């Protein structure tokens, strides 16, 4: 149980982020979830309230350094020092490299990777002072195996893994762990938009013969956030139905 530990989950409006926020809340965490808009923040606040979870939603653009700093200050004031950070916010801008525009590359690296640097850096001091903390980064199977048309996304997600291993070595002596969860193909709004042929092709690559559920990812995050994972750091937990085995 997480016993009132303040948890920040970015990109928590729906899908994987929402499932993580709800699961950590059920485990006893106080949950601060972020969205890109005030409407999204209200959505987060509403579902936390409906589930009987203590916490709130906050509007935050992870690419705006000043806004990120102000939001974390607001979370600290309203909820307390952040003990668990889940870097989940992410976007896609798929294109073949020959056709990729600079902004498609830059948008992905900024949102998916630089935000992890920015948020992790800001939560470190209170975690170091408390001599405990958990940073959990949501990467992707694509960051390990690659995918045509996603050089930008794969680079960002692979970068998250390298970042996490390096930071784990820097701050392990302060009892702060840094780990990744790497989802495979998950049943979300994006995969539901695929036609039957595309879905069948995806499922054909997965030994468990189904798409993952958002709850599968939330359960992995809850494990890494909880006491059972106190001796786990610098690891990447693959949750992909056997699509990638290492």
What are these regions (language model features)?
Residues 172, 177, 232-234, 240:
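Short, small/polar-rich loop/turn modules that mediate ligand/substrate recognition or access, typified
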Residues 140:
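Residue(s) in the substrate-gating loop at a strand-loop-helix junction
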Residues 27-44:
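Conserved glycine-rich Rossmann-like NAD(P)H-binding loop of the short-chain dehydrogenase/reductase
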Residues 96-97, 101-109, 191, 202:
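Substrate-binding pocket helix/loop in short-chain dehydrogenase/reductase
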Residues 120, 156, 164:
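Active-site helix of classical SDR
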Residues 6, 13-15:
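Conserved glycine-rich cofactor-binding loop
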Residues 125, 169-173, 230:
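Alpha-helical segment proximal to the catalytic Tyr-Lys
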């Amino acid at each position: 149980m997480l016993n009132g530990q303040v948890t920040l989950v970015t990109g928590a409006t729906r899908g994987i982020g929402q499932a993580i926020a709800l699961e950590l809340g059920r485990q006893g965490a106080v949950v601060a979830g972020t969205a890109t808009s005030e409407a999204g923040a209200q959505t987060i606040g509403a579902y936390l309230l409906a589930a009987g979870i203590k916490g709130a939603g906050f509007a935050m653009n992870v690419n705006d350094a000043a806004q990120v700093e102000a939001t974390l200050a607001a979370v600290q004031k309203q909820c307390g020092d952040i003990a668990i950070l889940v870097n989940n916010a992410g976007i896609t801008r798929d294109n073949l490299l020959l056709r990729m525009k600079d902004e498609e590359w830059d948008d992905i690296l900024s949102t998916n990777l630089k935000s992890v640097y920015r948020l992790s850096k800001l939560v470190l001091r209170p975690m170091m002072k408390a001599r405990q903390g958990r940073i959990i980064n949501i990467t992707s199977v694509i960051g390990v195996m690659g995918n045509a048309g996603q050089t930008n996304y794969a680079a960002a997600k692979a970068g998250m893994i390298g970042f996490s291993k390096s930071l784990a070595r820097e701050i392990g002596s302060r009892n702060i762990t840094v780990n990744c969860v790497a989802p495979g193909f998950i049943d979300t709004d994006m995969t539901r938009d695929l036609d039957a042929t595309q879905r069948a092709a995806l499922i054909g690559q997965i030994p468990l013969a189904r798409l993952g559920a958002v709850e599968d990812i939330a359960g992995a995050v809850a494990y890494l956030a909880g006491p059972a994972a106190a001796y786990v750091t610098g690891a990447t937990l693959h949750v992909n139905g056997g699509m990638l085995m290492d």
